[in-house]
């Protein structure tokens, strides 16, 4: 059994993917093989976890009994088991049909079910117990995201010696939305169990501070509030990407060659317009398809000079809103191709698939215009990845004002995705921008991201948490 880690990450999912081929870097555990998943969070936390012999607690992604704890590249992994029922109620239900839509501005109506809440609580309790078991005395525990909002308080109850951080990867809603949540006081008290609660944007932190005062009468000053005789800090830490990794990939001759090949396969159009998202109703996929269709109908764009590639990664496929979205998106793609495609040249290439990092990098390199048009998004890493991949190539980013990334990527072609004419206008400006201007915009955004990468994000959060820990100790 894993014991006594000075640094523990608790997240819904483990940072590894199960491998089915013969990848040499994979590790075995109970007959199953794993490798680190390519996400930015893993890359950011890997050095900290490796240096401190850290532990990551999370679910393997499939229902049923969990494999035994194992190690991948110096990180101890403690898999959590979720039964079929728990996947349905805690993951698909309370996390992704109640909290996800509510925190994303109610863009789809959240569904409230009592039995989902009960299971959410039970599963959160199990994650907290697992963290309490592996954390060394005085350890730092960093809890991630909306699936585990009750964990900080549950953990503190069992282990008051721990320094507890929480980071919310999605937006934190304004008071009037949060107040709809039947479990609202419990969720808020859950988060207040942390010493530091991190948000993507300042607005999220402010919403949280105001909500605590409104719901629990907790006084605050600046970013610090007082709760049950403790200080809790709420601040913004905008997450970022592994900029160097994406730049390296985009510089790789094989990736460049693949980008050329992609353009050739698309019929060497003048303009390749790209969208890359999980197939999620928060991402504004339909809105951007509609803007493209209207520009084709207006004659401002035409096939085969302009083509669109929409990658829509399968996601949460058993949740009703996601099934409905898939039908709507696929109908719209069919309509556009029916009206504007030519034999052998569809107007929209729609790919409901997952890709490797290098294939994604090749797509970014191949695209003249990247469309990121969420109705609401905590950050949106795809926008940042596209910028990182465009080293010398210019290219233009159309970006929704409602993505957290819009707070940093000010040289993008910003738009309001609800305003169709505005989206069309931003897309046309991106398509027609001259090369010098495109390069100028891209290089300003790159300069920003080179400095504000995911490693900077993790160390800012952890330094801030350590400072709180230091202050606490000084007070005692
Ligand atoms: P979200 O976290 O809501 O899915 P983000 O844009 O912040 O949205 O992050 C998505 C991450 O998933 C990015 O790192 C992106 O590269 C990756 N990704 C998106 N689509 C695919 C895909 N089809 N295959 C593999 N990775 C993908
Ligand atoms: C968002 C959430 C993450 C989640 C990811 C993929 O980024 O903030 O917590 O892991 O989407 O969603 P999934 O439901 O497949 O884990």
Ranges and model annotations:
Residues 1-476:
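Catalytic cores of carbohydrate-active enzymes across secretory and cytosolic contexts
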């Amino acid at each position: 059994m894993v014991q006594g880690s000075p640094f523990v990450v608790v997240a819904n999912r483990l940072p590894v993917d199960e491998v089915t081929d013969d990848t040499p870097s994979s590790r075995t555990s109970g007959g199953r093989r794993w490798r680190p998943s390519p996400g930015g969070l893993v890359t950011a936390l890997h050095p900290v976890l490796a240096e401190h012999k850290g532990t990551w607690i999370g679910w393997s992604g499939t229902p049923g009994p969990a494999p035994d704890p194992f190690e991948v590249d110096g990180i101890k992994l403690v898999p959590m088991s979720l039964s079929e029922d728990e996947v349905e109620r805690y993951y698909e239900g309370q996390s992704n049909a109640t909290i996800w839509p509510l925190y994303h501005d109610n863009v789809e109506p959240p569904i409230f079910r009592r039995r989902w809440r009960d299971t959410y609580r039970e599963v959160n309790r199990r994650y907290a117990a697992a963290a309490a078991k592996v954390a060394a005395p005085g350890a730092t525990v960093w809890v991630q995201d909306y699936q585990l909002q009750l964990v900080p308080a549950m953990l503190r109850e069992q282990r008051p010696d721990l320094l507890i951080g929480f980071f919310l990867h999605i937006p934190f809603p304004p008071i009037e939305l949060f107040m709809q949540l039947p479990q609202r006081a419990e969720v808020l008290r859950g988060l207040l169990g942390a010493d530091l609660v991190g948000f993507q944007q300042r607005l999220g932190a402010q919403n949280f501070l105001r909500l605590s005062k409104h719901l629990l009468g907790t006084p605050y000053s600046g970013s610090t509030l007082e709760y049950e005789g403790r200080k809790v800090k709420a601040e913004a830490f905008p997450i970022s990407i592994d900029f160097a990794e994406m730049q390296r990939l985009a510089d790789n001759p094989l990736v460049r060659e693949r980008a050329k090949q992609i353009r050739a396969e698309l019929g060497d159009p003048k303009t390749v317009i790209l969208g890359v998202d999980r197939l999620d109703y928060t991402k504004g996929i339909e809105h951007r398809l509609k803007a493209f269709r209207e520009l084709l109908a207006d004659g401002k764009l035409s096939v085969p000079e302009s083509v669109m590639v929409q990658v829509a990664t399968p996601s949460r496929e058993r949740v009703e809103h996601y099934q409905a979205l898939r039908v709507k998106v696929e109908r719209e793609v069919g309509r556009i191709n029916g009206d504007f495609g030519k034999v052998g040249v569809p107007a929209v290439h729609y790919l409901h698939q997952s890709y490797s990092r290098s294939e994604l990098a090749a797509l970014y390199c191949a695209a003249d215009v990247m469309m990121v048009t969420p109705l609401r998004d905590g950050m949106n890493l795809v926008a940042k990845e596209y910028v990182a991949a465009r080293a010398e190539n210019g290219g233009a980013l159309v970006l929704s004002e409602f993505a957290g990334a819009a707070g940093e990527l000010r040289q993008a072609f910003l738009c309001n995705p609800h305003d169709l004419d505005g989206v069309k206008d931003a897309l046309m400006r991106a398509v027609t921008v001259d090369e010098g201007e495109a390069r100028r915009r891209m290089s300003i955004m790159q300069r920003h991201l080179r400095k504000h990468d995911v490693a900077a994000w993790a160390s800012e959060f952890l330094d801030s948490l350590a400072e709180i820990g230091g202050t606490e100790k000084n007070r005692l």
